[in-house]
Amino acid sequence: NKANSKAYKPARERITQLDINWNIIAWPGLAWAKRMFPDLAEDDAQARLAEAIFMASRVNEEDPVASWKTHNQTLKEKREWLNQKDFKEIHFKGPGTDLKVGLADDHEWMGGASMAQNGVICNPNIPSEEVFTTPHALRVEGYVSSTKPLSHQGTLIDNIRVVFEKGSITAVSYTHLRAHETS
């Protein structure tokens, strides 16, 4: 909401400039756990989802810190490979999706660990498997559809379809929208 966004702006600016070390960590709320494991009792569903998060976060590894160092090196190698290729566009194809996304001139691939202003390496998102770059604002063509529901600020949205022409959204549709509990 607007008030929350305004109040959080100073912190968000410090975070995006890496003035401070920060991290976002997933934790299983009851509604999320029951959606993932509907046949389990509430406590069991939360425990099962917590275990999945621990596994994806490398917490269960014998040496989680070493595991993250190895993972960060892998992400760095992927970023470097993508930057060397200097792709002009990415073409996404899949169920309900045929989307070409042009990449910005002089784009750079990023992701994985970051160095904060204090010299400490941090992983902003745990778990994370992503590398990312900047799209060209005017070179997005085609359509993309969701294959899973989207949870946006406490609302589940299903069957999303978005059509792009010359970088602009020209059509949006969805078939289901409902509020859900986030606890």
Q: Where are the regions a protein language model picked out?
A:
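Short, basic/aromatic recognition patches
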Residues: K148
